[in-house]
Swiss-Prot record:
This is Translation initiation factor IF-2. Its main location: cytoplasm. It is found in: Cytoplasm. GO terms for molecular function: GTP binding; GTPase activity; translation initiation factor activity. Residues 300-468 form the tr-type G domain. One of the essential components for the initiation of protein synthesis. Protects formylmethionyl-tRNA from spontaneous hydrolysis and promotes its binding to the 30S ribosomal subunits. Also involved in the hydrolysis of GTP during the formation of the 70S ribosomal complex. Residues 355-358 are annotated as: G3. It comes from the Bacteria. Keywords: Cytoplasm, GTP-binding, Initiation factor, Nucleotide-binding, Protein biosynthesis. Residues 334-338 are annotated as: G2. Residues 309-316 are annotated as: G1. It comes from Tropheryma whipplei (strain Twist).
């Protein structure tokens, strides 16, 4: 029995009914044992892995030892009994002599068509002619089965050293030589023998090996890394309660659960490393290019200064004072909602300024501004002091490892206290120079212009003292996209900051998922420029789509190369987005949620004028916390006007369209009115966040509140064949109303709940309500267990809106 199982398991995967036949039982019994072991099979025809077969045989022997013994007792002994009866007629010396005495001219054994046993291992004796046929044929005709069973005898098999004509059965008729297994096959068999069995499949254990995967990788990608079939990994995921397909993008948490189950460790490659590997596959190595620059190639470049701080502390007004413009009046709500990049002249030198939003929703924008800057100017209002976004901007500047200059603004206002600002900043390890530190504090008034020249001088002094600002202007351009938008007449327009090299009109560029040839470049004043050296911000036209703020841009040699890089980035970003939006749902939770209808979601489409504002709005909405019952799904986001395709998508997915500083075209407006799509427009970001939060709370199921209506004491109990048990009551408080919900209370304990006042009478009249101080007869439907002294409490369930 055991040999049959092991032998069959190694050669192929046996069916369940075959294993049941070997064990002498039925398939139903084995299916029950497999269910207890945690292995689930669909039918008796299901194939089993060898380790599962071994565990099943062991479990069956432990559970049904009597059947195993009975199987052993009824095993037929025929092969064991008949085998020793064959040897007596053919003594061993004669066989040995026959092998040696075959003449060279004799016909080859096995080729005689009249021989009764061609290919057998026994030979005729080489005695006289009269003896040989009689003796050989008599034995051969008598017991052919016995002589056939003597074939595996050890002596004839060992005495066959001659290859050509020694042993019968040559030319493929006898015993074939055993092929030696390769080391790889032996190692695989050994690994599979010790491999764990999960969900009915066998997967080699990883023993802690680290597997690197890209964001948004699929089960197929993981399977290729560890050299197993994707179907096996899907079986393991299903065993763990996860539903997925072979090509579906999974999140990091799902990969960690899967890898831990089979003995691996998963490391998700960061987006920067992933993009670096992508560029290197196209022979673009940014680090190597910077290393190749010699000292003679480097030239001095202007410093890049980012103005940061809390909202309404005067950052944009300060920049307007420096530039002699009025940017603040153009921003909705009086707050900056875009990143602005400008270059101004200070004497005979240039300084590039980047203005970042101060509102809390624009954290990502401030982080990007800190990464591309050389110096951070931290604006703090002298009357407000340090605020939350002030601390956040300080953290961004420190994480970017850039020097800081503190501008204490609004010193012209009443109640301004610059000394207090300096003392508060020391609590965050920002020590002014007058206190013995290394940070310059400049008192300014952006409104009157007081101290602005001193601030510019402090910026240049910091740049000369702490930084070595040089770049190679003679190579292909590299930089970063500061902001991007979709212009009605110009198409996709991106504000880029050149960090090295020189960007020229006609260059082939790729930034994020957008690519194209630079058709035109203009500066911050709208004047056309032909080239942009390092630290120069320009607006670029000619891109295929709107890139995201913060995307790096590079110049490549061919249009085809730019398109391939952009398409590959778009595919990676799509996979990462799918993995991010995928919610891990167990089988039980998924089924239960559908049955109970607990899943509610608000689908949204966000369109904005610039990509940075769309990103900030999306990030702020994702942080809204309104409980687990309601989810927010952003099914599409983009830059530009609201189009008819956006309305069509909202119609299909029952979504709300949010327009941030954009409007729908005529077709989209008509389609939205016809389909009843909710389209909302905002120009200030926190207005949008507040309205959407209220909408999400409106999706929440109202809280149910129980209100007490009245209490009655049972004085008498009457029984009626028509209406059942009737309680004669005295109303103690409130009122008793017909059809009201009620509960029966006895000695302070609720005896019966969820009752209804089915009948209510006062004397012989049916009434709808009996107030406190009066007596009445109360019927509680089929409830008959009513005793004198019980209390009947009526209640009302009301819906209470969520706070």
């Amino acid at each position: 029995m055991g040999v049959g199982l092991c032998g069959r398991g190694i050669v192929a995967k046996p069916r369940l009914y075959e294993v049941a036949s070997d064990l002498g039982t039925d398939s139903k019994t084995l299916m029950g044992i497999l269910r207890e072991m945690g292995e689930f099979v669909k039918s008796p025809s299901s194939a089993l892995e060898p380790p599962v077969v071994r565990k099943l045989a062991k479990a069956f022997a432990e559970k049904y030892p009597d059947k195993v013994e009975e199987k052993k007792e009824h095993t037929p002994p025929a092969p064991v009994v008949e085998t020793p009866k064959a040897p007596p007629p053919l003594p061993r010396p004669i066989i040995r002599h026959a092998v040696r005495g075959v003449p060279s001219g004799a016909p080859r054994p096995g080729n005689n068509p009249y021989a009764p046993r061609q290919g057998m291992g026994q030979l005729a004796t080489p005695g006289p002619a009269t003896k040989r046929p009689v003796k050989f044929k008599a034995e051969g005709d008598k017991k052919p089965a016995s002589t056939h069973r003597r074939v595996p005898a050890p002596l004839p098999q060992k005495r066959t050293p001659l290859r050509g004509r020694g042993a019968p059965g040559a030319f493929g008729r006898g015993n074939k030589p055993k092929s030696r297994k390769s080391k790889t096959l032996k190692r695989q068999e050994f690994e599979m023998r010790d491999a764990p069995v999960i969900g009915g499949v066998t997967i080699p254990r990883g023993d802690g090996r680290v597997i690197r995967l890209m964001q948004g990788a699929s089960v197929t990608d993981f399977a290729e890394k560890i050299d197993v079939l994707p179907a096996n990994l899907l079986s393991v995921l299903f065993h763990l309660g996860e539903m997925a397909t072979a090509t579906e993008s999974l999140d990091e948490a799902t990969f960690e659960i899967l890898a831990e189950e089979i003995g691996y460790k998963v490391q998700i490659v960061s987006p920067d490393d992933e993009d670096r590997a992508l560029l290197e596959s196209f022979s673009v190595n940014l680090a190597a290019e910077h290393a190749e620059d010699s000292e003679l190639d480097l030239a001095i470049r202007p410093p890049v200064v980012t103005i940061m701080g809390h909202v309404d502390h005067g950052k944009t007004l300060l920049l307007d004072t420096i530039r002699n413009t009025n940017t603040l009046a153009e921003e909705s709500g009086g707050i900056t909602q875009h990143i602005g990049a400008y270059q101004v002249s200070v004497g005979d030198r240039f300084v590039t300024f980047i203005d970042t939003p101060g509102h809390e929703a624009f954290t990502a924008m401030r982080a990007r501004g800190a990464k591309v800057t050389d110096i951070a100017v931290l604006v703090v209002a002298a009357d407000d002091g340090i605020m939350p976004q002030t601390i956040e901007a300080l953290d961004h500047a420190r994480s970017a490892d850039v020097p800081i200059v503190v501008a204490v603004n609004k010193i012209d206002k009443e109640g301004a206290n610059p000394a207090k600002i300096r003392q508060q900043m020391t609590e965050f390890d920002v020590i002014p120079e007058e206190y013995g530190g290394d940070v310059m504090f400049i008192d300014i008034s952006a409104k009157t212009g007081q101290g602005v020249d001193a601030l510019l001088e402090a910026i240049l002094l910091t740049a000369d003292a702490a930084l070595e600002l040089r770049a190679n202007p003679d190579r292909t351009a590299r930089g970063v996209t500061i902001e991007a938008k979709l212009d009605a007449g110009r198409g996709a327009v991106a504000t880029v900051l050149v960090q090295s090299g020189t960007l020229r009109v006609g260059d082939r560029v790729v930034t994020g998922c957008a690519y194209g040839r630079v058709r035109a470049m203009v500066d911050e004043n709208g004047l056309p420029v032909e080239s942009a050296p390092p630290s120069r911000p320009v607006r670029v036209q000619g891109l295929s789509s709107v890139p995201k703020a913060g995307d790096s841009f590079i110049v490549v040699a061919e249009d085809r190369q730019a398109r391939q890089i952009a398409e590959k980035r778009e595919a990676n970003e799509r996979n990462a987005q799918l993995a991010k939006s995928r919610k891990r749902v167990s089988l039980e939770d998924f089924t239960r949620a559908i049955q109970e209808g607990r899943v509610q979601s608000l689908n949204m489409i966000i369109k904005g004028d610039v990509s940075g504002a769309v990103e900030a709005l999306e990030e702020s909405l994702s942080k809204l916390d309104v409980g687990e019952e309601v989810s927010l799904r952003i099914i599409h986001r983009g830059v530009g006007a609201i189009t008819e395709s956006d309305v069509n998508l909202a119609t299909v997915d029952n979504a709300v369209v949010i327009g941030f500083n954009v409007r729908p075209d005529r077709k989209a407006r008509d389609r939205a009115a016809r389909e009843g799509v909710d389209v909302r427009f905002y120009s200030v970001i926190y207005d949008a966040i507040e309205d959407i939060e209220k909408s999400l709370k409106g999706l929440l199921k109202p809280e149910l509140e129980e209100r007490k209506l009245g209490l009655a004491i049972v004085k008498e109990v009457f029984h009626s064949s028509r209406v059942g048990t009737i309680a004669g009551c005295s109303v103690e408080s409130g009122s008793i109303t017909r059809n009201a919900k009620a509960r029966l209370i006895r000695d302070g304990v609720v005896v019966v709940n969820d009752l209804t006042v089915t009948s209510l009478r006062r004397f012989k009249d049916d009434v709808t309500e009996v107030k406190s101080g009066f007596e009445c007869g109360v019927g509680l439907g089929s409830c008959d267990d009513i005793r004198i002294g019980d209390e009947i409490e009526t209640i009302q369930i009301v819906e209470k809106p969520r706070a």
